């Protein structure tokens, strides 16, 4: 298998207020007929990635029922699979996922059994349409160990994001989380392609109990001058992890698609969902 997609879909979503009171963030309805998770799943399916795992944790029932066998996204085929990965009890330790990378680390045996060449790590609460094949193409051309999707943002808003500084070849020189005086406008989208051996190396050697990609894994790889690059994405993307951003994303749909940059009904890149 070439690519295994792992979608982080266990966030409690307290900043979404009552919307996520009885369901996990990615299971929250969006634009009437969709769920937020539909975007990451449809992007995988449209990109030809049919081996997908969802890492769930908080109130997973609604999400599990929505996903089912994965048929709307073509994950029920003989050469496809979709797996729900819940945290499990470990000897002498907390079973809950403690950080983004810890969630992946707790499923390290799953990755080893799948034995993919690359692991694509996604967030389950973003609204966007992206062909991951272009990102993978750049990853291979750069002979990268890790490629991170970034979006250029207005420099006056850059202090709200994790920001990367890169050289002329887009190799990452520095990363700073929410800098007071940003030196770049390349904001992290929380989308990563790892070479599997590099991912496993860092999951196994970093001992932080709350292991996180932004706080621990990425800074360590940059500090050790590993081959870490960015892939620039400049189309519509919205992290809907807060009530305000969720409302903004829904209001964006009132505008003309050419103004906003996203069309939910474009037949060339469909967003699939479960038919109730």
Question: Where are the regions a protein language model picked out?
Answer:
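Conserved N-terminal catalytic core of the sugar/cofactor nucleotidyltransferase
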Residues: 1-7, 15-21, 29-123, 127, ...
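Left-handed beta-helix
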Residues: 1-4, 197, 204-276
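Active-site glycine-centered loops adjacent to acidic/histidine catalytic or metal-binding residues
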Residues: 11, 125, 242
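A structural signal for short hydrophobic beta-strand segments in well-ordered beta-sheet cores
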Residues: 27, 163-166, 230
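Glycine-rich beta-alpha junction loops
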Residues: 59, 89, 153-154, 179, ...
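Residues that scaffold the ATP/ADP-binding catalytic core of kinase and kinase-like folds
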Residues: 66, 175, 201-202, 249
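Conserved core of the sugar-phosphate nucleotidyltransferase
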Residues: 129-197, 204-206
């Amino acid at each position: 298998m070439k690519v295994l997609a792992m979608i982080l879909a266990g966030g409690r979503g307290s900043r979404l207020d009552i919307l996520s009171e009885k369901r996990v963030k990615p299971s929250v309805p969006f634009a009437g007929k969709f769920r937020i998770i539909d975007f990451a799943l449809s992007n995988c399916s449209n990109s030809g990635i049919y081996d997908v795992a969802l890492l769930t944790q908080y109130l997973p029932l609604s999400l599990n029922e929505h996903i089912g066998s994965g048929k709307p996204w073509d994950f029920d085929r003989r050469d496809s699979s979709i797996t729900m990965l819940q945290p499990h009890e470990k000897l002498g330790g907390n079973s809950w996922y403690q950080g983004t990378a810890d969630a992946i680390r707790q499923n390290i045996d799953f990755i080893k059994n799948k034995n993919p060449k690359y692991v694509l790590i996604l967030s389950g609460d973003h609204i966007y349409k992206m062909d991951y094949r272009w990102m993978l193409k750049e990853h291979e051309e750069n002979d990268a160990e890790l490629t991170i999707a970034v979006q250029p943002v207005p420099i006056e808003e850059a202090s709200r994001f994790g920001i990367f500084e890169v050289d002329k070849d887009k190799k990452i020189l520095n990363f700073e989380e929410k800098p007071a005086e940003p030196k770049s406008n390349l904001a992290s989208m929380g989308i990563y392609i790892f070479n599997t051996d590099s991912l496993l190396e860092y999951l196994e050697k970093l001992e932080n109990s709350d292991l996180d990609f932004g706080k621990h894994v990425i800074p360590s790889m940059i500090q050790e001058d590993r081959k870490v690059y960015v892939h620039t994405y400049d189309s519509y993307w919205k992290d809907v992890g807060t009530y305000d951003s969720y409302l903004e994303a829904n209001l964006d749909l009132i505008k003309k698609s050419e103004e906003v940059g996203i069309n939910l009904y474009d037949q060339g890149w469909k967003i699939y969902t479960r038919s109730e």
